[in-house]
Amino acid sequence: MPKHATSLPLSLPAPPSGTPLYRWFYNELRTAILDGRIAPGARLPATRDLAHEYKLARATVVASFEQLKSEGYVEGKVGAGTFVTQVLPDDLLQVGRSSAGKSVGHRRVQWSSYARRLRLYPGVGPRTTRAFRANQAALDVFPTTLWAQVVARRLRRASAQLLSGGEALGYRPLRQAVAAYLNTSRGVKCSSEQVLIISGVQEALERAAHLLLDPGDPVWMEDPGYPGADIVFRAVGATVHPVPVDDEGLDLEWGRHHWTNATLLYVTPAHQFPLGVTMSLRRRLALLEWARRSRTLIFEDDYDSEYRYQGRPIPALQGLDRAGVVIYAGTFNEVLFPALRLAYLVVPPGMVDRFAAAQAVSMRHAPLLDQAALCDFITEGHFARHIRRMRELYSERLAVFLEASRSRLGGLLEIPEVEAGLQTVGWLAPGINAQHAAVEAAKHEVEVIPLSRYSARRVARQGLLLGFAAVDARELRRGAEQLARALETCPTR
C-alpha cells in the first residue's frame, strides 16, 4: 500500500490491528478534511479509482464514503460525483476561518493528549428512523400529551428553590423514586444517597473513567461490545483489553488466561450489547468473586433490562454484590425518549463524595425542572404503565419481525431466538460480507450495522445488528423485503 497518494493528500499509516479497514480509511479521509488538506467543496476521486490506488476493496471505500455522508462531511451530486461539504459538522474542532479565507483552525492549537486521543473518533448526529434501526425506542407511540401535562403542571408549581438550583447528586425526590424503582424492578440495593442523576450512561462512563483510571490502567471490555465505552476509556489513556463473549456472557476464564487483572471491567450483563446474551447467575457470582479477590471495580451498564420477553429476569450484579465493587448505571433516555437526557448512576457509599464533587465541577446538576417532571411521572404510576405497554408493543413488533425475516430472509440471514431488548444479531449466510451487506442495505433504505463495527478482533462469523422496536409492523415487513433484495445482490466468496 503506498504511503503517499497522488490523487488525495493522504499519509496513510498501517491500519491498527483489529480496526476494520473501512473505519481506518474513513478516519484518514475525515482527518484530511478537518485539517484542510482536502478543502471544502473539493471533489473526491471515484471510489473505484481510490480502491485501485490504495489496494482496497471497492466496498471498503464505498463504506467509508457512506459514513462520511451520514455525518455531513461529504455530499453526493447526481452525475457530478462526491464533494466535501462547504460547512463541516465539526465546528468545535475548527477554531474558525479569517475573512480572507486563511485557516486559523485547530492545527495551531496545542491540544492535550486527551483531546488528541478523542478526535480520532467520529461524532454522531440525528438520523431518519427506518427499518431496522437499532438502539431506539418506539417514539411514535410515546404519550407526548401526558408528558406535556406533567411538565406544564410541574412548571406552574415550581418553587423558587427549584428554579434556583439544587444538589449536585440530583433532585432528591427523584433520587428516592429511582432507588425505590431499582430495588423493586432490578434487585438493586441502595439508598437515595448513593444515586446520582446524570444526562446518560455515556456521561456516567466518562465520570467513572476520569475518577478511577490513570493512563495505562487496564480495562476489560466485552468483545464485541459497546463502542461508546471503548471511546471513553481510550480517551483517558486506559489500555482496553477485549474479552470474548460466550453463551453465558463475558468469558471470565478466557480473560484471566489472556490478560492481567484489570483496574475496571465494563459489562452489560442484562442484555449484552450487541449479541443479546444474558449473563448467567453462575457467571455473575464468579465475576463478583474474581473482582473482590483482584480488587477490580465493575461498571455495570444495565442496558435493555426493562424489556424481557422470555424467562425470569436475573437480579442486577449490583444487587448480588457484597463487597462494594459494582458501579451501576441505567438510563431513562431509551425507555422514554432520547432527548430527555436523564439517567442514573448508583455508586458504593465510599465513592459518593468523589462522584458528587466531580458532578458539581463538571455540570453542577441535570436540569431540575426535567428531573422534577420525571419524578412526578414515576410516582404517579405513569412510568410503570408505560413500560408495561411498551413491553407488550415490542413483543408484538418482535413477532412481526421474526415472521417477516423467516419468510423472506431464509437462507440469507439467520435470526436467533430473541429473549430481551430492542434489537438482535442476524447471522449472514456463508460468503456474504457484512460490510458489503450494510452498504447494499442502505441503498435499499434499510439500516443495519455490521457486527465487526463493535469488535476489536476479527469476527469469526459475519453478522448484522438489526433493531425491531423503532418502527411499526408495516415498516418491518417492508424492511425485510428490501433487506432480502439487498442481500441477494451481494456477491458470495
Positions of predicted regions on the chain:
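Conserved core of the PLP fold type I
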Residues: 151-295, 306-307, 312-323, 394, ...
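N-terminal basic, amphipathic alpha-helical segments
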Residues: 1-153, 350, 356, 360-367, ...
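Helix-loop "lid/cap" segments that line or gate small-molecule binding pockets
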Residues: 344, 372-380
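Active-site PLP attachment segment
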Residues: 320-354, 369
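Short glycine-rich anion-binding loops that position phosphate/pyrophosphate groups of nucleotides
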Residues: 137, 269-273, 334, 471
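Short histidine/acidic/glycine/proline-rich micro-motifs that form metal-
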Residues: 136-139, 246, 272-274, 304-307, ...
